[in-house]
Amino acid sequence: MNTPSQAQVRRAIAEAQTIVVKVGSSSLTEPSGHLDPQRLNALVAAIARVRLMGGRVVLVSSGAIAAGFGTLGFDKRPTDVADQQACAAVGQGLLMAQYEAAFARYGLRVGQILITVSDTIAPQQYRNVRRTLDRLLDLGAVPIINENDSLASNEIRFGDNDRLSALIANIVVADALVLLTDVDALYTAPPSEPGSKRISYVPNVEDALAKVQVGGTGSNVGTGGMVTKMEAARVAAVSGIPAVLTCASNAGPAMMGDPVGTAFAPINDRGSSRRLWIGFASHPQGTLVADSGAAKAVRGGAASLLAAGVVEVKGDFAAGDAVWVDDEQGNHLAKGLVGFDSEEIPQMLGRNTAQLKRFLGEEYAHPLVHRDNLVLV
Ligand SMILES: Nc1ncnc2c1ncn2[C@@H]1O[C@H](COP(=O)(O)OP(=O)(O)O)[C@@H](O)[C@H]1O
Ligand SMILES: N[C@@H](CCC(=O)OP(=O)(O)O)C(=O)O
């Protein structure tokens, strides 16, 4: 695809039918661990304007922990996971109450969806998330999403909402992703560093990643810093979705396509949201080792992984889990959702479809990983 000009990217954002807006903790809360209703209301006003003009907006909002820790008597964001989970349980309610009241002033309803990684990699939950989001949007509501911090385990969690927002943009087939934070744009280095320069347009985020010096959070409530925002912009770009990054007070102009913040061009045509989800969100639970013929077929991009071409299975997983597909040298070729439990697979290895049917029955005469569930890495 040809690289679009900045004006084209800004126009695409202005014309977006479906927009995912992600807002960070520092844009909604006080450092003392309480909500800042004024800033939250200003954000809601900008989103409501787009919504009332007919746009479909999904809001991915951080801020549960940051809104809850002051209320629970902590003087700074706790580091203990159980404390954070308790703060999130309190703060999430406060956050939603505030959003509910703020959107109601414009006659708009909100719907809360809390997501954990483990919920969303299973095909059925993925479909449920997608269906609920689509229905909320069809009904004119504004879905508000956060990670389910009170339930997420420390080992498997998004941890930041930046990447989650890019995955949500895929799920709802968004036309634009708007990342709102406490800095007005991406800079060539963390803005605290002397000489860092504002970047208004990134035609290729993968090239930019090599050139820009990105750092962690600048506030005491944010988590991901610019690293995860760049990753979100990259996921959006490779998914064919233009993105803009700016401060929350620029939300309105950013969604109108005004030249604020940093615009990121898409670098691919749109992909299948399901495949992107597998590629970005899933955590492989095991490995299928492909022989050289199967490795070549998988690398070609259009083939399913058949039992006949698999020489080894590693790990303990259930049908529907994500697995790595490796070559015999141990290189990762692809990630996929496997169709069988790990203990069923050894008896299937090396057998073609006719043999699987004859020896094991009809239900085994299927690929280990169907090509629709396979994503090259
Ligand atoms: N190259 C960079 N350009 C802009 N900001 C950067 C850069 N590197 C690091 N940062 C920091 O990232 C911070 C935003 O991330 P974070 O604090 O996690 O915000 P949020 O709570 O909105 O997710 C900025 O305040 C800034 O200090
Ligand atoms: N899910 C957490 C926030 C995680 C997060 O991404 O925070 P931030 O870096 O402020 O966007 C919460 O609501 O407190």
Curated annotation (Swiss-Prot):
Binding positions (ATP): 22, 181-182, 223-229
Covalent S-S links between cysteines: none
GO CC entries: cytosol
InterPro entries documented for this protein: AceGlu_kinase-like_sf, Asp/Glu/Uridylate_kinase, G5K_ProB, Glu/AcGlu_kinase, Glu_5kinase, Glu_5kinase/COase_Synthase, Glutamate_5-kinase_CS, PUA
Entry keyword Nucleotide-binding: yes
Catalytic activity: L-glutamate + ATP = L-glutamyl 5-phosphate + ADP
EC number: 2.7.2.11
One BP annotation, GO: L-proline biosynthetic process
Cross-referenced PROSITE patterns: GLUTAMATE_5_KINASE, PUA
Subcellular location: Cytoplasm
A GO molecular-function annotation: ATP binding
Domain (PUA) ranges: 285-359
Enzyme class of the recorded protein, top EC level: transferase
Domain of life where this protein originates: Bacteria
Pathway of action: Amino-acid biosynthesis; L-proline biosynthesis; L-glutamate 5-semialdehyde from L-glutamate: step 1/2
Binding site residues for substrate: 62, 149, 161
Keywords: Amino-acid biosynthesis, ATP-binding, Cytoplasm, Kinase, Nucleotide-binding, Proline biosynthesis, Transferase
SMART domains: PUA
Function in brief: Catalyzes the transfer of a phosphate group to glutamate to form L-glutamate 5-phosphate.
UniProt similarity note: Belongs to the glutamate 5-kinase family.
Full protein name: Glutamate 5-kinase
Organism, as annotated: Bifidobacterium adolescentis (strain ATCC 15703 / DSM 20083 / NCTC 11814 / E194a)
